Amino acid sequence: VSAFVRRASGGGNHTVARVALDAFPPPAAPRMGGLATLTAELRSGRLARHFGFDLGNAEAETSAAFEIDPCPAQDFNGAGFLYFSSFVGFIDRAEWHFDGRRAARATTLARDVFFHGNIDPGERLRVRWLAPRRGEGRLVHRCLLERAGDGARLAEAFTLRAV
């Protein structure tokens, strides 16, 4: 999926917005169903549960957190956006930090990542590790990635791993 985006004048990555280009025909209306519907429901607060997690109760879930200082040369693209793959890498680092020794060879079976925002080079981010569950050779966890400076949500991830 591709989109054209722009930043507001002087706003950096905190002000990124999707834009339409006059030279291109309008995009086809999105088909509702599947991931598009799931994403819309999550962002609007209508999705109550995902991967077995109560989405309305993040603050009450057992939480640990650590901060990451992304490297401008490795984690950002030429336009100054944090790479989507870096988000996933930070989730894997959180798993390794909080649970890795128990699951050194874990294999990802499913992962849904919902992106909400971005950061500028030089900003730190926080990964919150929420209510991991283990059982029957599986590890399921939810992570929130937040801008460390103001707590703004950057992404929400749900992962199922074989351990």
Where is each model-derived feature located?
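Beta-strand secondary-structure signal
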Residues: 67, 126-128, 140-142
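A general secondary-structure signal for short beta-strands and their flanking turns/coil
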Residues: 61-65, 124, 138
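Residues in well-ordered beta-strands of folded domains
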Residues: 2-5, 69, 114
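Hot-dog-fold acyl-thioester-processing enzymes
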Residues: 8-109
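HotDog/MaoC-like acyl-thioester-processing domains
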Residues: 1-39, 121, 131-163
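Hydrophobic beta-strand-centered segment that forms part of the acyl-chain substrate-binding groove
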Residues: 94-135, 154-162
